[in-house]
Amino acid sequence: MMISSVLVAGVVAVSAALASKHPKQYSFKPEDAETIWNGDIPVLYDFGDSQSASYSGSWWTSSYITGTNGEQYLVISHYLDTPVFTYFRASTLNLETLDYNQFITLGNNTANSTTLDVKVGDNGIQSLTADNISQQRAYANDENVTFDITFDATSRVISNAGAGVFQFGPSITYEWGLPNCRTQGSVTDTGGKNITVDPAKSFTWYDRQWGTAAVTSGNWTWFQMHIPETSYKLSVWIIDNDVTNQFSRFATIRGDNDEFQVLPLEWKPIYDRTYQSTAADILYPLDWELDISGFGVFQLSSILDDQEIVGTTAIQTAYEGFVTFNGTVHNKKVQGYGLVEVVYSNWESL
């Protein structure tokens, strides 16, 4: 057993403390890479070409914002295009007051087939440069969630599973991300105040994913993890598929000098703290343990129970929560922050 019983016994107290005593300031810093990829590791597609809407799929951002007034926010945007529907959803979380807002809107595909410009109504994600990557924009104009964020490709790619492709339930999925992009723009708080982004203390994780067929039949949990004062960026997948009897647990870790590790892991959701979904009969855990083979052990906690984006179906609904964590990397103590995403492909089996 990779996670000891002693560790399990101590997680509840640690998790509660992390959730209730989050620091007032997190260390949000962009990277300053000159190129996003050096080409030594072969991938199966061109990053710029994959931005085209003709590939369909998912365009997603999570922006870790520090305002020029010192306030900090997590801002999420997501555009998904499927053969059945198209949606844009977004959320904002004030990391000090824990004021949370979210929305989802459905519409027809209005994407440009060659240049990245995907939107539903007055909400979307677009490229501002001809290469579809160097500079992008995410924006939302909902009654309770309003932002206009621009981010530059100043971060080296994290290519999931090493080559940017892996089995996702019954199908193949392709996924890559830019984990620490320089960010500017503005966010509007609940009171209508416009917060200007401080580019030196903010960054965006951009994620691009598309596939060949249906998603996994079960649920999936994904963690994005940042360890300040190190170069490690972690993309952690837990994927369940009862139809194929495939249960994947792996982490893609980007380190120094474009070093990639793809490692198996053990994970444990802890249900001592939970959040009851307002959309379905789902009880989300708010604490987790990860034991990444040969790398480290982590205890993660959501800082707020309700961080659900609520749709009318399972695939439209997601728990997109800011998390903090304690742990060890190669036996050295670390702390960090990131995000957890929990999605169910259907609610029929619940």
Curated annotation (Swiss-Prot):
UniProt-listed Gene3D superfamilies: AttH-like domain
Lineage top rank: taxon: Eukaryota
Catalytic activity: kievitone hydrate = kievitone + H2O
GO BP, one annotated term: phytoalexin catabolic process
A Pfam family per the record: Lipocalin_9
GO molecular function, one term: kievitone hydratase activity
Enzyme class (EC, first level): lyase
Keyword Ubl conjugation included in the entry's annotation: no
Record keywords, A-Z: Detoxification, Glycoprotein, Lyase, Secreted, Signal
Keyword Lyase belongs to the record: yes
InterPro entries recorded: AttH-like_dom_sf, Fungal_Dehydratase/Hydratase
Inducing or repressing factors: Up-regulated by biochanin and phaseollinisoflavan.
Signal peptide: 1-19
A single GO cellular-component term on record: extracellular region
Entry's localization field: Secreted
Primary localization: secreted
Enzyme Commission number, as recorded: 4.2.1.95
Record text on subunit structure and interactions: Homodimer.
Function as written in the Swiss-Prot or TrEMBL entry: Converts fungitoxic kievitone to the less toxic kievitone hydrate, and thereby protects the pathogenic fungus against this phytoalexin.
Name of the molecule in the record: Kievitone hydratase
Annotated source species: Fusarium solani subsp. phaseoli
